[in-house]
Amino acid sequence: MMVMISLHFSTPPLAFLKSDSNSRFLKNPNPNFIQFTPKSQLLFPQRLNFNTGTNLNRRTLSCYGIKDSSETTKSAPSLDSGDGGGGDGGDDDKGEVEEKNRLFPEWLDFTSDDAQTVFVAIAVSLAFRYFIAEPRYIPSLSMYPTFDVGDRLVAEKVSYYFRKPCANDIVIFKSPPVLQEVGYTDADVFIKRIVAKEGDLVEVHNGKLMVNGVARNEKFILEPPGYEMTPIRVPENSVFVMGDNRNNSYDSHVWGPLPLKNIIGRSVFRYWPPNRVSGTVLEGGCAVDKQ
């Protein structure tokens, strides 16, 4: 937009300024420089003649004004911007704001390769523990001498996807409903040996474990049971479990058969302590059920 302004005045030149209260004219200290104020403060387009009391020469000055967007007010650049520091200029503050607004630390960035690797590893580990195998710690003497306090073992979970538990399997299991009624929870995990399966008739008589009327030959127990137990028929989808330390074990002879759904897995390997590393599966597997 082009604006032509024609001003006629007497030398020495004057700058036209308007104050907030009263209009007044200020003499320009530099006669060779014409000072202009914003359009809103200029007193024009009237012709102005000033009588200074002296004989002054009169001259006419023509001015052209052009609208330049570079003159409009802009935000001040950051003090850290520019080419002096060799940076990209003006983005440092934004980076600080983004850093403060992070929900997770930079190393936990879901888009980074390292974070993805960690999360995949955790997911695989949890899946392995939930579906395949998990480590366990022995806290008591109920399975002594097979397991001592502090022994660590691996319990696998794959076998029971394809078959039902067999006699002599050492299983870890969540507390059954009868124990949860007296304060136990699913977080309470036990380890015992299966001595009878569904449909079997089990009893303890004269220091012998009897299954379907036949005494079991158990070389792995600490000592013969010192109690009597009347015959019990193991219900469907259940097993009967006992500790190898028969006289110091809180097991099925006290609280009854164990539902199969409470079984977590089967002990297959002891990896601690080093001098007792060994497998925990008896030779013959489920052959005892065929005797």
Curated annotation (Swiss-Prot):
One of its GO terms (biological process) is protein maturation. The gene is PLSP1. InterPro entries: LexA/Signal_pep-like_sf (IPR036286), Pept_S26A_signal_pept_1 (IPR000223), Pept_S26A_signal_pept_1_CS (IPR019758), Pept_S26A_signal_pept_1_Ser-AS (IPR019756), Peptidase_S26 (IPR019533). One of its GO terms (molecular function) is peptidase activity. Involved in the maturation of the plastid protein translocation channel. Required for the biogenesis of plastid internal membranes. May also function as a thylakoidal processing peptidase. Disruption phenotype: Plants are albino and seedling lethal. It catalyses: Cleavage of hydrophobic, N-terminal signal or leader sequences from secreted and periplasmic proteins. It is found in: Plastid, Chloroplast envelope; Plastid, Chloroplast thylakoid membrane. Signal peptide: none annotated. The lineage of its organism: Eukaryota, Viridiplantae, Streptophyta, Embryophyta, Tracheophyta. This is Chloroplast processing peptidase. It comes from the Eukaryota. The active site is at 142. Disulfide bonds: none annotated. CDD domains: S26_SPase_I. Residues 1-67 form a transit peptide.
